[in-house]
Amino acid sequence: MQRLRWLLLLIVVLVIGASFVLVKLPLQLGLDLRGGAQLTIEVQPTKEIPQIDNDSLVAVKTVIENRVNALGVSEPLVQTAGEDKIVVQLPGVTDPGQAERILGGTAQLEFQQQRPGTEGEFQAEYSIKRQLDAELENLRRSGASPENSDRLEELIKAKEESNKALLALFEPMGLTGKNLTDARPSPNQSGTAWEVALRFDEEGGQKFAELTQAVAGTGRSLGVFLDNDLISAPVVGVEFANTGITGGAAVITGNFTIDTANDLAVQLRGGSLPFPVEVVENRTVGATLGQESIRRSLVAGFVGLVLVLVFMAVYYRLPGIVADISLMIYAVLTLAAFALVGVTLTLPGIAGFILSIGMAVDANVLIFERTREELRAGNTLYRSVEAGFFRAFSSILDSNVTTLIACAALFWFGSGLVKGFALTLAIGVMVSLFTALTCSRTLLLVIVLSLPKVRQNPRLFCPNLSSVTAKS
């Protein structure tokens, strides 16, 4: 009995802890429940590869997945559509423009050295580029208008010409974004602006040292190009003329805000796209769909749960009421587990949760039927309850293990919503195993051992029991 009291205390503590978790860590909802951004990205062929094949599409999809993961979006969906398109769903994203900038940019980073004898021409071209960048930024902030649209188109063409002119003043040195191991936004030393801190691999660190050594003290710039756009052109001091900048680290400075620095860092961490892409659709999934889905799901789940609770109480009497209490404990513990693990609830995920409730009920049904068989065989109520749990254990364990194996296969080979379904079902199955074999058993045995009137009235467990010798 002492052991049962400790188990009962453990159950109470778990329920209180789970309730606290649910208050402090609200459940995350997926795109279909709370809205977000959905982008359709079209992969563009090149002169070298005029036809996009499946391998090319998968390569682009992998890079986009890396960028999405770097964004920190929970339960994203990235999947191919047709021969040259990729659909990206980002739950909870409130700035689809940022998502388009990060996912749509090729992000081909390259470090180049300025050619000797081009100092004067570079200063003139770089000044023009900065003026164009400033005017472009002002136009974008001022919003769309017919006049702005025409001027914006002119500025974009002028910037393309400026980029070509600047690119001709530099020469590649073989140092690209492929040599990066990390990229993070960070404030500069004065704390007044933002920059992007880079970390190179061993080969990249050596190349960066050679590149900085080549331009150190010459007055020529080290060009940092992103998609052939010169984003930074620092001059390396003469103190690095002998060894270059060693250590395998560098920073990209420029006119960065915290948002633009983070966007660039995310792109660089995700890797460059092997093909140019175009975002052909960028739409926001409204909250109305999410609210309607939540309402219908909650109604369906509530009605189903009430019917199950009523059936268990009517058909199984006292054990059924105990099972109902266990089911409520199960619901609290499972939702808390979802919050702790970071599960994002989608409609398929809710379906997995409801299915796991059915499996929890099934476990209790097996236990109570075995208990009734023991009572009909003439055993005492206490022994019948213990034997019922013991005899049902192997069947319950087998069914739950096979379900978990299926969940593992779905999670391993599936993607997106299928993974969400598998994860919620697996968590629900594991929690249901605990509640059925621990919570239900503990509550029943405490009632039987603590209440003599219950112990002497086995018909509370088996209504049509003819006669049973009630023993303490």
Swiss-Prot record:
Q: Name one GO molecular function term.
A: protein-transporting ATPase activity
The answer on whether this UniProt entry bears the keyword Ubl conjugation reads no
Report keywords, A-Z: Cell inner membrane, Cell membrane, Membrane, Protein transport, Translocation, Transmembrane, Transmembrane helix, Transport
Spans traversing the lipid bilayer: 7-27, 298-318, 326-345, 349-368, 392-414, 432-452
Any one biological process term the GO annotation gives: protein targeting
| GO annotation, cellular component aspect | plasma membrane
**Which subcellular locations apply to this protein?**
Cell inner membrane
Which Pfam families is this protein grouped with? Answer: Sec_GG, SecD_1st, SecD_SecF_C, SecDF_P1_head
Does this UniProt record's set of keywords contain Lipid metabolism?
Answer: no
Q: What InterPro entries does the database record attribute to this sequence?
A: Acrflvin-R, SecD, SecD/SecF_arch_bac, SecD/SecF_CS, SecD_1st, SecD_SecF_C, SecD_SecF_C_bact, SecDF_P1_head
Membrane topology annotation: Multi-pass membrane protein
Note the subunit structure: Forms a complex with SecF. Part of the essential Sec protein translocation apparatus which comprises SecA, SecYEG and auxiliary proteins SecDF. Other proteins may also be involved.
Name the family: Belongs to the SecD/SecF family. SecD subfamily.
Q: What does this protein do?
A: Part of the Sec protein translocase complex. Interacts with the SecYEG preprotein conducting channel. SecDF uses the proton motive force (PMF) to complete protein translocation after the ATP-dependent function of SecA. Probably participates in protein translocation into and across both the cytoplasmic and thylakoid membranes in cyanobacterial cells.
What this protein is called in its record is Protein translocase subunit SecD
- In its UniProt entry, the species of origin is given as Synechocystis sp. (strain ATCC 27184 / PCC 6803 / Kazusa)
